[in-house]
Amino acid sequence: MAKGQSLQDPFLNTLRRERIPVSIYLVNGIKLQGYIESFDQFVILLKNSISQMIYKHAISTVVPNHTNNQEHNQSQYNNNNACISKP
């Protein structure tokens, strides 16, 4: 397994397994949105109203889209871990 794959696989697998919506930006600037249905060494299958096979060499960035529940959980995490300063 290539060293780069060790970062990609867990990241993409979490997005796929938890069905987190993603925005995929291509190197030509096009933005695609959907859910990662599957992936391998060379391609990602993106599912929205249709399935699209996207070659990884054409991808610039993969961005998870946060849902309200995820934002709420992050807000709770930040509030619970905030530093309390004493006068």
Curated annotation (Swiss-Prot):
GO terms for molecular function: RNA binding. Residues 66-87 are annotated as: Disordered. Pfam families: Hfq (PF17209). The keyword Repressor does not apply. One of its GO terms (biological process) is regulation of DNA-templated transcription. The keyword Transmembrane helix does not apply. Residues 9-68 form the Sm domain. Keywords: RNA-binding, Stress response. GO terms for cellular component: cytosol. Belongs to the Hfq family. Homohexamer. RNA chaperone that binds small regulatory RNA (sRNAs) and mRNAs to facilitate mRNA translational regulation in response to envelope stress, environmental stress and changes in metabolite concentrations. Also binds with high specificity to tRNAs. This is RNA-binding protein Hfq. It comes from Wigglesworthia glossinidia brevipalpis. The gene is hfq.
